[in-house]
Amino acid sequence: MSQDYYQILGVSKTANSADLKKAYHKLAKQYHPDNAAAGDTNAEKKFKEINAAYEVLKDEQKRAAYDRFGHDAFQNQQARGGAGSQGGHPFGADINDIFGDFFSDFMGGGGRRKPTSSKVRGSDLKYNLTINLEEAFHGVEKNISFSSEVKCDTCHGSGSEKGETTTTCDACGGVGATRVQQGFFMIEQTCHKCQGNGQIIKNPCKKCHGLGRYHKQRNLSVNIPAGVENGTRIRHPGEGEAGIRGGNNGDLYVDIAIKPHDIYKVDGANLHCKLPISFVNAALGGEVAVPVIEGGKVNLTIPAGTQNGDQLRLCGKGMSKIRSTIRGDMLAHVHVEVPKNLSKRQRELLEELRGESANEKENDGSFFNKMKSLWS
């Protein structure tokens, strides 16, 4: 068995990247051709071995492959992959090509890139849809209109005239790419003849010009489920743009925006509203009819002594929830209204009430009396 890369660098198999780098720099400096004696071929050979070892071990993926398959297997693959290459690369071939073939052979591949398909998946589309709060509560079906690429109905997405077939590109052998030698490296580039498709259409469809799709205005009915929230995204599989030359369609994403409501403010599944009541109802209590999101009104009990800013809750009268029979609550925020214009009789009654209230305050040592005593 030949000396492996760890032995060449003089490090253990558990060496970290810092140890590898330190060992490499030390040895590279020692055996660099500029520092070697004239005619010392051993130094040049050693220098190449050091570079080859470091090129593999400094790369985590390549090092993992080397550790897994062993030095001899790697060397055998190098011998096959390096035949006919030029440029004086330490491995005699592009390191990426070597490892590409290396993995292919061990995983059952043949070292050749598989032919590419000319089919390309269509792009996804996004549509912004605005609905009102009632529609969000009940759910709604909406008709939307948008422009997109659709499958050609003449060639049925193939890109060829009726009855015509595609042929494999003779420039790239159907892989969609060709390789060009540039210095030490083998560069892969898109095939100029088939534009990366791997196939040649000899007689393109006149309607879609060989793409298998064309631009069209579309109308689509979309279902918005009850309980959607502002910002909900709904996916419609296969309703995006048609693929190229028979490729799969993309998806359509509908983003929901809910318009602000005149009465309600939304907080998750709960609804908040302002509830104006008279100061008489606030003091004495009673019932008021309040509108609800599903339509109509329900009676809400006002407890006696309700204060301005109090919250009154109607359980189960909020928004729907997606895939649930449970609803949120409605919270009414009390706003006590004080009349600005009083009749003579109303004024007399309030004056009478004020007199009685003053007597009560004096007897119970109220806050107002305590304040009064501070200033007396």
Swiss-Prot record:
Subcellular location: Cytoplasm
GO molecular function list: ATP binding; heat shock protein binding; unfolded protein binding; zinc ion binding
Zinc finger residue extent: CR-type: 139-217
Domain J: 4-70
One GO CC term, this protein: cytoplasm
Cofactor (UniProt): Zn(2+)
Residues reported in the UniProt entry to bind Zn(2+) 2: 169, 172, 191, 194
One Gene Ontology biological process: DNA replication
Cross-referenced Pfam families: DnaJ, DnaJ_C, DnaJ_CXXCXGXG
Keywords: Chaperone, Cytoplasm, DNA replication, Metal-binding, Repeat, Stress response, Zinc, Zinc-finger
Spans of repeat CXXCXGXG motif: 152-159, 169-176, 191-198, 205-212
InterPro entries for the chain: DnaJ, DnaJ_C, DnaJ_domain, DnaJ_domain_CS, HSP40/DnaJ_pept-bd, HSP_DnaJ_Cys-rich_dom, HSP_DnaJ_Cys-rich_dom_sf, J_dom_sf
Subunit structure: Homodimer.
Family statement: Belongs to the DnaJ family.
Listed name of the protein: Chaperone protein DnaJ
Highest classification ranks of the organism: Bacteria, Pseudomonadati, Pseudomonadota, Alphaproteobacteria, Rickettsiales
Gene name of the encoded protein: dnaJ
